Protein backbone atom coordinates (compact mmCIF):
# COMPACT_ATOMS: atom_id res chain seq x y z
CA UNK A 1 0.00 0.00 0.00
CA UNK A 2 1.34 3.42 -0.91
CA UNK A 3 1.69 6.25 1.57
CA UNK A 4 -1.03 8.11 -0.28
CA UNK A 5 -3.41 5.22 0.30
CA UNK A 6 -2.37 4.61 3.88
CA UNK A 7 -2.63 8.22 4.92
CA UNK A 8 -5.32 9.45 2.55
CA UNK A 9 -7.25 12.47 3.82
CA UNK A 10 -10.96 12.92 4.06
CA UNK A 11 -12.54 15.72 2.03
CA UNK A 12 -13.10 17.93 5.15
CA UNK A 13 -9.46 17.48 6.16
CA UNK A 14 -8.20 18.49 2.74
CA UNK A 15 -10.42 21.56 2.76
CA UNK A 16 -9.18 22.53 6.23
CA UNK A 17 -5.58 22.31 5.01
CA UNK A 18 -6.29 24.43 1.95
CA UNK A 19 -7.97 27.16 3.96
CA UNK A 20 -5.44 27.30 6.80
CA UNK A 21 -2.10 26.47 5.19
CA UNK A 22 -2.34 27.24 1.48
CA UNK A 23 -0.85 30.68 2.13
CA UNK A 24 2.40 29.18 3.44
CA UNK A 25 4.12 28.90 0.03
CA UNK A 26 3.38 32.56 -0.59
CA UNK A 27 4.80 33.53 2.80
CA UNK A 28 7.95 31.58 2.00
CA UNK A 29 8.36 33.55 -1.20
CA UNK A 30 7.85 36.81 0.67
CA UNK A 31 10.45 36.22 3.34
CA UNK A 32 12.94 34.71 0.91
CA UNK A 33 12.87 37.85 -1.22
CA UNK A 34 12.08 40.64 1.20
CA UNK A 35 15.65 41.50 2.17
CA UNK A 36 16.82 41.48 -1.44
CA UNK A 37 13.98 43.62 -2.79
CA UNK A 38 13.79 46.15 0.00
CA UNK A 39 17.41 47.11 -0.47
CA UNK A 40 16.74 48.12 -4.07
CA UNK A 41 15.84 51.72 -4.83
CA UNK A 42 13.47 51.06 -7.69
CA UNK A 43 9.89 51.02 -8.91
CA UNK A 44 7.93 47.93 -9.85
CA UNK A 45 5.54 48.96 -12.61
CA UNK A 46 2.60 46.98 -14.01
CA UNK A 47 1.01 48.35 -17.21
CA UNK A 48 -2.73 47.71 -17.31
CA UNK A 49 -5.50 47.72 -19.90
CA UNK A 50 -5.33 47.16 -23.63
CA UNK A 51 -2.41 47.68 -25.98
CA UNK A 52 -2.52 51.46 -26.35
CA UNK A 53 -3.17 52.04 -22.65
CA UNK A 54 -0.20 49.90 -21.70
CA UNK A 55 2.07 51.64 -24.18
CA UNK A 56 1.33 55.15 -22.95
CA UNK A 57 1.42 54.14 -19.29
CA UNK A 58 4.81 52.46 -19.69
CA UNK A 59 6.21 55.51 -21.49
CA UNK A 60 4.91 57.78 -18.73
CA UNK A 61 6.30 55.62 -15.93
CA UNK A 62 9.71 55.22 -17.58
CA UNK A 63 9.99 58.99 -18.10
CA UNK A 64 9.11 59.57 -14.44
CA UNK A 65 11.74 57.12 -13.26
CA UNK A 66 14.44 58.64 -15.47
CA UNK A 67 13.53 62.06 -14.07
CA UNK A 68 13.96 61.01 -10.43
CA UNK A 69 16.86 58.60 -10.97
CA UNK A 70 15.13 55.39 -9.87
CA UNK A 71 15.52 52.03 -11.59
CA UNK A 72 12.35 50.53 -13.06
CA UNK A 73 11.26 46.93 -13.43
CA UNK A 74 8.07 46.30 -15.39
CA UNK A 75 6.09 43.06 -15.39
CA UNK A 76 3.76 42.38 -18.33
CA UNK A 77 0.67 40.32 -17.44
CA UNK A 78 -1.68 38.55 -19.82
CA UNK A 79 -5.37 39.09 -19.07
CA UNK A 80 -8.74 39.62 -20.73
CA UNK A 81 -7.77 43.12 -21.91
CA UNK A 82 -4.60 41.96 -23.69
CA UNK A 83 -4.07 38.23 -23.95
CA UNK A 84 -0.51 38.20 -25.29
CA UNK A 85 3.01 38.26 -23.80
CA UNK A 86 5.23 41.21 -24.63
CA UNK A 87 7.86 39.06 -26.36
CA UNK A 88 5.26 37.82 -28.87
CA UNK A 89 4.53 41.38 -30.00
CA UNK A 90 7.64 43.52 -29.71
CA UNK A 91 11.43 43.33 -29.72
CA UNK A 92 13.13 43.29 -26.29
CA UNK A 93 13.48 46.77 -24.79
CA UNK A 94 17.02 48.12 -24.48
CA UNK A 95 16.69 51.31 -22.46
CA UNK A 96 18.87 52.41 -19.57
CA UNK A 97 17.27 51.86 -16.19
CA UNK A 98 14.45 49.64 -17.46
CA UNK A 99 13.89 45.91 -17.29
CA UNK A 100 10.66 44.56 -18.76
CA UNK A 101 9.70 40.91 -18.50
CA UNK A 102 6.66 38.75 -19.03
CA UNK A 103 4.94 37.56 -15.85
CA UNK A 104 5.75 34.15 -14.38
CA UNK A 105 3.24 32.01 -12.50
CA UNK A 106 4.72 33.29 -9.24
CA UNK A 107 4.19 36.90 -10.34
CA UNK A 108 0.46 36.25 -10.62
CA UNK A 109 0.46 35.48 -6.88
CA UNK A 110 2.69 38.35 -5.83
CA UNK A 111 2.92 41.21 -8.34
CA UNK A 112 -0.38 41.18 -10.22
CA UNK A 113 -2.89 43.94 -9.49
CA UNK A 114 -4.96 42.88 -6.44
CA UNK A 115 -8.55 42.26 -7.52
CA UNK A 116 -11.48 39.92 -7.05
CA UNK A 117 -10.26 37.36 -9.60
CA UNK A 118 -7.10 36.69 -7.53
CA UNK A 119 -8.88 37.13 -4.19
CA UNK A 120 -6.63 40.17 -3.55
CA UNK A 121 -3.86 37.76 -2.54
CA UNK A 122 -1.04 39.84 -4.16
CA UNK A 123 -1.83 42.73 -1.81
CA UNK A 124 -0.32 40.83 1.14
CA UNK A 125 2.99 40.44 -0.67
CA UNK A 126 2.98 44.04 -1.90
CA UNK A 127 2.29 45.50 1.53
CA UNK A 128 5.27 43.65 2.96
CA UNK A 129 7.68 44.19 0.07
CA UNK A 130 7.10 47.80 -0.97
CA UNK A 131 7.16 51.10 0.86
CA UNK A 132 3.95 52.14 -0.90
CA UNK A 133 1.67 51.05 -3.74
CA UNK A 134 -0.57 52.99 -6.12
CA UNK A 135 -3.13 51.09 -8.17
CA UNK A 136 -4.76 52.16 -11.43
CA UNK A 137 -8.05 53.35 -9.94
CA UNK A 138 -6.22 56.01 -7.90
CA UNK A 139 -3.97 57.44 -10.61
CA UNK A 140 -6.39 59.80 -12.38
CA UNK A 141 -7.90 61.22 -9.15
CA UNK A 142 -4.39 61.81 -7.78
CA UNK A 143 -3.32 63.58 -10.96
CA UNK A 144 -6.38 65.84 -10.75
CA UNK A 145 -5.32 66.67 -7.19
CA UNK A 146 -1.82 67.59 -8.48
CA UNK A 147 -0.22 64.72 -6.60
CA UNK A 148 3.60 64.89 -6.62
CA UNK A 149 4.48 61.65 -8.42
CA UNK A 150 8.14 62.67 -8.55
CA UNK A 151 8.49 62.99 -4.77
CA UNK A 152 6.63 59.72 -4.30
CA UNK A 153 8.77 57.78 -6.77
CA UNK A 154 12.10 59.32 -5.76
CA UNK A 155 12.16 57.41 -2.46
CA UNK A 156 12.07 54.10 -4.32
CA UNK A 157 10.72 50.71 -3.22
CA UNK A 158 7.30 51.47 -4.69
CA UNK A 159 4.70 49.59 -6.72
CA UNK A 160 2.68 51.30 -9.43
CA UNK A 161 -0.03 50.02 -11.77
CA UNK A 162 -1.55 52.29 -14.41
CA UNK A 163 -3.26 52.43 -17.79
CA UNK A 164 -2.99 56.22 -18.24
CA UNK A 165 -0.36 58.72 -19.35
CA UNK A 166 -0.17 60.21 -15.86
CA UNK A 167 3.22 61.83 -16.53
CA UNK A 168 4.30 63.69 -19.71
CA UNK A 169 6.67 61.92 -22.09
CA UNK A 170 8.38 62.54 -25.42
CA UNK A 171 6.33 60.87 -28.15
CA UNK A 172 9.56 59.71 -29.83
CA UNK A 173 10.12 57.47 -26.79
CA UNK A 174 7.25 55.26 -27.95
CA UNK A 175 9.19 54.28 -31.06
CA UNK A 176 12.22 53.32 -28.96
CA UNK A 177 10.28 51.30 -26.41
CA UNK A 178 7.92 49.48 -28.77
CA UNK A 179 9.65 48.06 -31.84
CA UNK A 180 7.39 45.57 -33.67
CA UNK A 181 8.73 42.10 -34.41
CA UNK A 182 10.04 41.52 -37.97
CA UNK A 183 6.92 39.68 -39.18
CA UNK A 184 4.72 42.51 -37.91
CA UNK A 185 7.02 45.11 -39.45
CA UNK A 186 6.79 43.40 -42.84
CA UNK A 187 3.00 43.70 -42.79
CA UNK A 188 3.24 47.39 -41.92
CA UNK A 189 5.66 47.96 -44.80
CA UNK A 190 3.39 46.03 -47.18
CA UNK A 191 0.46 48.30 -46.39
CA UNK A 192 2.60 51.41 -46.80
CA UNK A 193 3.67 50.19 -50.24
CA UNK A 194 0.02 50.60 -51.28
CA UNK A 195 -0.13 54.24 -50.19
CA UNK A 196 -0.68 56.96 -52.76
CA UNK A 197 0.78 60.46 -52.71
CA UNK A 198 -2.03 61.37 -50.33
CA UNK A 199 -3.12 58.64 -47.91
CA UNK A 200 -5.22 59.39 -44.85
CA UNK A 201 -5.79 57.17 -41.83
CA UNK A 202 -9.22 56.42 -40.37
CA UNK A 203 -9.82 54.63 -37.08
CA UNK A 204 -13.45 53.71 -36.37
CA UNK A 205 -14.01 51.91 -33.07
CA UNK A 206 -17.35 50.23 -32.65
CA UNK A 207 -17.60 47.03 -30.60
CA UNK A 208 -16.78 47.99 -27.00
CA UNK A 209 -16.44 51.76 -26.58
CA UNK A 210 -19.77 53.52 -26.09
CA UNK A 211 -18.31 57.04 -26.09
CA UNK A 212 -16.69 56.44 -29.48
CA UNK A 213 -19.91 55.01 -30.89
CA UNK A 214 -22.02 57.95 -29.69
CA UNK A 215 -19.60 60.82 -30.32
CA UNK A 216 -17.96 59.53 -33.53
CA UNK A 217 -20.82 58.35 -35.76
CA UNK A 218 -19.94 56.85 -39.13
CA UNK A 219 -21.52 59.82 -40.92
CA UNK A 220 -18.80 62.14 -39.59
CA UNK A 221 -16.07 59.90 -40.97
CA UNK A 222 -17.79 59.66 -44.36
CA UNK A 223 -18.10 63.45 -44.55
CA UNK A 224 -14.41 63.90 -43.72
CA UNK A 225 -13.27 61.27 -46.23
CA UNK A 226 -15.49 62.71 -48.97
CA UNK A 227 -13.91 66.13 -48.43
CA UNK A 228 -10.43 64.61 -48.73
CA UNK A 229 -11.36 62.83 -51.98
CA UNK A 230 -12.91 66.00 -53.39
CA UNK A 231 -9.77 68.01 -52.61
CA UNK A 232 -7.31 65.39 -53.87
CA UNK A 233 -8.24 62.83 -56.51
CA UNK A 234 -5.26 60.65 -55.51
CA UNK A 235 -6.59 60.13 -51.97
CA UNK A 236 -6.42 56.67 -50.48
CA UNK A 237 -7.81 55.59 -47.12
CA UNK A 238 -6.19 53.24 -44.64
CA UNK A 239 -9.01 51.99 -42.41
CA UNK A 240 -8.47 50.45 -38.97
CA UNK A 241 -11.66 49.18 -37.35
CA UNK A 242 -12.99 46.43 -35.11
CA UNK A 243 -16.22 46.20 -37.12
CA UNK A 244 -16.64 44.00 -40.19
CA UNK A 245 -19.82 45.90 -41.04
CA UNK A 246 -17.85 49.15 -41.22
CA UNK A 247 -15.29 47.51 -43.51
CA UNK A 248 -18.04 46.34 -45.85
CA UNK A 249 -19.70 49.75 -45.89
CA UNK A 250 -16.43 51.55 -46.64
CA UNK A 251 -15.44 49.06 -49.36
CA UNK A 252 -18.80 49.59 -51.02
CA UNK A 253 -18.42 53.36 -50.93
CA UNK A 254 -14.72 53.86 -51.72
CA UNK A 255 -13.73 50.74 -53.65
CA UNK A 256 -10.03 50.57 -54.57
CA UNK A 257 -9.26 53.70 -52.58
CA UNK A 258 -9.69 51.68 -49.39
CA UNK A 259 -6.82 49.81 -47.73
CA UNK A 260 -7.78 47.64 -44.76
CA UNK A 261 -7.08 44.28 -43.16
CA UNK A 262 -8.91 41.29 -44.58
CA UNK A 263 -8.83 39.47 -41.23
CA UNK A 264 -11.43 40.08 -38.54
CA UNK A 265 -10.22 42.04 -35.51
CA UNK A 266 -9.60 39.84 -32.46
CA UNK A 267 -7.75 41.03 -29.37
CA UNK A 268 -8.12 37.66 -27.63
CA UNK A 269 -5.49 35.94 -29.79
CA UNK A 270 -1.84 36.75 -30.36
CA UNK A 271 -2.43 36.91 -34.12
CA UNK A 272 -5.30 39.33 -33.60
CA UNK A 273 -3.27 41.57 -31.29
CA UNK A 274 -0.44 41.60 -33.82
CA UNK A 275 -3.02 42.75 -36.34
CA UNK A 276 -3.87 45.61 -34.00
CA UNK A 277 -0.21 46.63 -33.89
CA UNK A 278 -0.09 46.56 -37.69
CA UNK A 279 -3.15 48.83 -37.79
CA UNK A 280 -1.72 51.27 -35.24
CA UNK A 281 1.71 51.58 -36.85
CA UNK A 282 0.26 51.84 -40.36
CA UNK A 283 -2.09 54.60 -39.22
CA UNK A 284 0.99 56.36 -37.84
CA UNK A 285 2.49 56.47 -41.35
CA UNK A 286 -0.47 58.22 -42.97
CA UNK A 287 -0.55 61.98 -43.59
CA UNK A 288 -3.58 62.61 -41.41
CA UNK A 289 -5.61 60.53 -38.94
CA UNK A 290 -9.34 60.78 -38.35
CA UNK A 291 -9.71 59.02 -35.01
CA UNK A 292 -12.50 57.94 -32.69
CA UNK A 293 -13.58 60.01 -29.69
CA UNK A 294 -11.68 59.17 -26.48
CA UNK A 295 -9.82 56.31 -28.14
CA UNK A 296 -6.32 55.72 -26.78
CA UNK A 297 -5.63 53.66 -29.93
CA UNK A 298 -6.22 56.71 -32.16
CA UNK A 299 -4.13 58.89 -29.85
CA UNK A 300 -1.19 56.47 -29.77
CA UNK A 301 -1.19 56.13 -33.55
CA UNK A 302 -1.01 59.91 -33.80
CA UNK A 303 1.80 60.10 -31.25
CA UNK A 304 3.81 57.36 -32.95
CA UNK A 305 3.65 59.14 -36.29
CA UNK A 306 3.70 62.73 -35.11
CA UNK A 307 0.49 63.22 -37.07
Describe the predicted segments one by one:
Residues 22, 29-32:
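Short hydrophobic alpha-helical segments enriched in small aliphatic residues
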Residues 55-66, 221-222:
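Histidine-anchored nucleotide/phosphate-binding helix
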Residues 50-52, 77-82, 165-166, 205-209, ...:
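Short, solvent-exposed loop/turn segments at secondary-structure junctions
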Residues 47-56, 209-215:
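A short, glycine/small-residue-rich beta-strand->loop->alpha-helix junction that serves as a flexible
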Residues 84-232:
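Secretory-pathway luminal glycosyltransferase catalytic domains
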Residues 235-307:
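Donor-binding and catalytic core of enzymes assembling or modifying cell-surface/extracellular glycoconjugates
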